[in-house]
Amino acid sequence: MKSNASPESFMIRDKNYSIVSCSPETLLLKKGNKIITKPIAGTLRKIKKSNRSSALKFFRNNIKETKEHNMIVDMERSDLSRVCVPGTVKIDKEKYVEEYRHLFHYVTTISGSLLKGMTIKNIIKSMMPGGSVIGCPKVRTLELLNQQEKENRNIFTGS
């Protein structure tokens, strides 16, 4: 985990298995009754003279990156809406750049107020796999993967 330092890292050790995850993306963050997701849709490799403002300009001027980002944000808002009080899912911070050692990511922060009685299992089931991993349409993509692949992916790319 030290060699691939990332803001969203964890390790689970069990008697029968271990899981290590290092990701720049916050798929789920629960703070009291509030749930937050920060989908990443857009990656730009750093070059010598690049900075956040040049990365933001690139993303905003790139139709493909912008459309993909909007698509993933819409999907994550929809996923959150299944576990949140109607009308509470909102974009807190839209289309900004996060800087990492070797690259820039295009990010949006989305939050909502959880429905009463919502469990972490319900939340995870609603959000997994993350939109930036699987793409749109999520359900159909998963169906196609299940038809083509012989084994279930289980723990895969943060999902």
Please annotate each region the language model reported.
Residues 1-159:
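Extended alpha-helical targeting/anchoring segments
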